[in-house]
Amino acid sequence: CPLLFTWLEQVQANNKNGEIYLTDIVELATQAGSKVACQIADEAEIAGVNDRADLAYLEAVLQTRLRNSAMQQGASLIAPETVFLNADTIIGQDVIIEPHVVIGPGTQIGEGSIIKSFSHIEGSKLGACCVIGPYARLRAGTDAGDGVKIGNFVETKKSTIGAGSKANHLTYIGDSVIGADVNVGAGTITCNYDGFGKFKTIIEDEASIGSNTALVAPVKIGAGAIIGAGSTITADVPNDAIATTRSALDVRQNAAIRYRNQRYEPS
């Protein structure tokens, strides 16, 4: 409408906020003798954002819509008001999301997966029937295959994790490629940063990493290899090998009694 541009030039910022309101065109059109019609819209669709309170209100509206859409498409949100989604989140059929979960941009969750409470996921792709959390953090670049388990207080970043693999507790997996059916024991750390650059850890199919292990990248653990608990691995381990770096156990009989006597001996 050519007249629209004419009226736009006449709109003034003569209101308490000093803003230009497009809706002032209605008054100008009426004054010019034009016929004016209106369509009733959802209030939230045309609401303005003048402060952080307005922004929070509209964010809540958006979150409600995203939650409802996810549930209508087959996901179960146990306490919907506590789950936060992103506009581009893709959630498969029969996914269960427990309370207090945050899903950031670029996340895809495969069908039948379970996201347990207090987990944070962003920039990640999960296959079918994964179990995540509680208290898990999946950072950008995480790509988990079908049936992967990432448990409590586990953090992943820029890592591919093969089908059926699991890291159930207290683990950091960064810049890694993990094969299928790998077990990563509690307290395992992929030491990917030397203060200057990031390096890759590779763990091949069916390897088993013992608890409290440090894998100093770049390093490769071969298929079927076993890493003993408490080891620090700084070199590649061949397929089906067992690698340990623990010191020998030193047991001193009755030494605890002598130690206590020395500590509490009157001066």
Predicted regions and their residues:
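Acidic, glycine-rich loop-and-beta core segments that form the ion-binding/anion-interacting portion
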Residues: 78-150
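Catalytic-core segments of class I nucleotidyltransferases/pyrophosphorylases
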Residues: 1-63
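Glycine-rich hexapeptide-repeat left-handed beta-helix
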Residues: 131-267
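Long, charged amphipathic helices and adjacent flexible linkers at domain junctions
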Residues: 59-88, 259-262
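Hydrophobic alpha-helical scaffolding
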Residues: 15-16, 45-48, 84, 171-172, ...
